[in-house]
A protein has these predicted regions:
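Mobile "lid/hinge" segments at catalytic clefts and subdomain interfaces of large enzymes
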Residues: 2-18, 27, 199-288
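Short, flexible, solvent-exposed loop/turn segments with mixed acidic/basic and small polar residues
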Residues: 81-87, 118-124, 278-283
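Small-residue-enriched alpha-helical segments and adjacent helix-cap loops
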Residues: 2, 6, 61, 68, ...
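Short amphipathic beta-strand starts and helix->beta connectors
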Residues: 73-81, 108, 112-119, 242, ...
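Short glycine-/aliphatic-rich beta-strand segments at the starts of folded cytosolic domains
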Residues: 41-101, 163-172, 250-258
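Compositionally biased, intrinsically disordered low-complexity regions
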Residues: 10, 66, 74-81, 153, ...
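Low-complexity, intrinsically disordered regulatory regions of RNA-binding proteins
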Residues: 4-68, 73-74, 182, 199
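Generic, well-ordered alpha-helical scaffold segments in large soluble proteins
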Residues: 4, 12-29, 38, 42, ...
Length: 288
């Protein structure tokens, strides 16, 4: 008798395109980044109650937006309630800060937005993002415009996409660093962010690029990390680590034992991210 066919895990490259879970279904129906036009031209005018549920609980994340939990609902109760019972009409907005570095103009803008729209509060996260709370959908277009005037954005700060790239916050200033990875990080950010090629991954994809000697980016728990090292001939470059993560299925990244030149980093990053996109498990979101 022929052996029973094993059920696929949703790997695109192996032809396992069905069945779709709810997250894969809304991503197939419309790309997450497309929701910006609806936010600016429809929802900001018509208000919270006009928002399509698939946008609200799915695609909004591609632009760094999550609904806040209603006051008085503890985290332990959320599994027993419907989404509509949990959601408040305010949003958390996450702003992407590549490498965790801000100019003085950018920092002033971040602070001004917090004062005007976020009840004088902004979080600095452990992945070098900034988060606002108490954001109304009506105010999102203006916040975006003000962020973009100083070169900031909430694009792909959440969702199944390449997340903000971690870097050493004192890159270029640390006397003990192996190399200043700022230019490499920015070149990789240009490939990763707002790129339709990587706009639909199986899950979030976390990156760290650092040339400092103290390993401040915790490279062991990122999906891909480039760690500053000296090559065999003493030339500065990067050691490559892949497959790390925390959350419900924590694991330590594996060192691949290859030396990556600074100019190779964006292409290597794209190759690894492409493997995750095409071979990552999409059927069960708890599997990696």
């Amino acid at each position: 008798m022929p052996s029973p066919q094993r059920r696929g895990q949703g790997q695109w490259a192996l032809g396992h395109l069905e069945p779709l879970n709810a997250a894969e279904r809304f991503k197939k129906d419309d790309a997450g980044l497309n929701v910006r036009d609806r936010i600016v031209n429809r929802y900001a005018y018509l208000g919270f109650d006009s928002i399509d549920p698939a946008d609200l609980r799915g695609r909004f994340r591609w632009w760094g937006l999550y609904t806040q939990r209603r006051p008085g609902i503890e985290g332990g109760r959320t599994g027993a309630l419907e989404d509509a019972e949990i959601e408040d009409s305010y949003f958390m907005m996450r702003v992407r800060i590549p490498g965790g570095q801000l100019s003085s103009d950018q920092l002033r803008t971040v602070a001004d937005i917090a004062k005007e729209y976020g009840r004088d509060l902004a979080d600095i996260t452990d992945r070098q993002n900034v988060q606002y709370h108490w954001i109304r959908i009506e105010d999102v277009p203006d916040i975006w415009a003000r962020l973009e005037e100083v070169g900031l954005s909430s694009i792909q700060a959440c969702g199944d996409v390449p997340r903000n790239i971690l870097g050493c916050p004192v890159a270029g200033l640390d006397d003990g660093e192996i190399l200043d990875a700022t230019a490499v990080l920015r070149a990789t950010e240009a490939v990763a962010a707002n790129n339709p090629e990587f706009g639909n991954l199986p899950r979030k994809f976390k990156t760290a690029i650092s040339g400092c000697a103290s390993h401040c980016t915790a490279h062991e728990v990122n999906d891909i990390s480039f760690v500053g090292v000296l090559g065999p001939d003493g030339t500065p470059g990067f050691d490559l680590w892949v497959g790390g993560g925390l959350s419900t299925n924590p694991m330590i990244a594996q060192r691949l034992g290859v030396f990556v030149r600074p100019d190779q980093v964006p292409a290597v990053w794209a190759g690894v991210a492409g493997l995750f996109r095409d071979y990552g498990y999409r059927r069960l979101r708890s599997r990696r």
